[in-house]
From Swiss-Prot:
One of its GO terms (biological process) is positive regulation of cell population proliferation. Belongs to the small GTPase superfamily. Rho family. Plays a role in immunological synaptic F-actin density and architecture organization. Regulates actin reorganization in lymphocytes, possibly through the modulation of Rac1 activity. Required for the formation of membrane ruffles during macropinocytosis. Plays a role in cell migration and is required for the formation of cup-like structures during trans-endothelial migration of leukocytes. Binds phospholipids in an activation-dependent manner; thereby acting as an anchor for other proteins to the plasma membrane (PM). (Microbial infection) In case of Salmonella enterica infection, activated by SopB and ARHGEF26/SGEF, which induces cytoskeleton rearrangements and promotes bacterial entry. This is Rho-related GTP-binding protein RhoG. It is found in: Cell membrane. One of its GO terms (molecular function) is protein kinase binding.
Amino acid sequence: MQSIKCVVVGDGAVGKTCLLICYTTNAFPKEYIPTVFDNYSAQSAVDGRTVNLNLWDTAGQEEYDRLRTLSYPQTNVFVICFSIASPPSYENVRHKWHPEVCHHCPDVPILLVGTKKDLRAQPDTLRRLKEQGQAPITPQQGQALAKQIHAVRYLECSALQQDGVKEVFAEAVRAVLNPTPIKRGRSCILL
């Protein structure tokens, strides 16, 4: 059976661990415990093919920047996460996560995932963001960023509501089993 290594990255507290625990156990964790490194494994059947999906949960906090990249070798697909309710985590995809992943693994496919989709219409979240002069990230903003970083797909999910979680990892498997050429936006012109 083919094994696929999927590394999940993104800012601290965007919901990476909840996404992985929800996918592997169908349960939502009750408390937030910052991750240093964790591994999960699941058999996944996608388009009639069964694979062993090795899921790597990484620390988003800056103090783990040097340690985190040790998990990158032999990665088959990256899932870069941001919270729909956190515009700074969205901006960090462009400024931190995409550059880091591309530096270490330039030819590995990327999925961009907006987490905590359930908070987009939640009154307390909307009020908090409005007080900061911000708003939740829209699906259109997610699609635009995915295009900008040449992600294979943009998906949204809510681990709390078990909405879109299975689709994230099905698409991660598809990105490996059915690769599309990765366009990085760089071209070489010889004169």
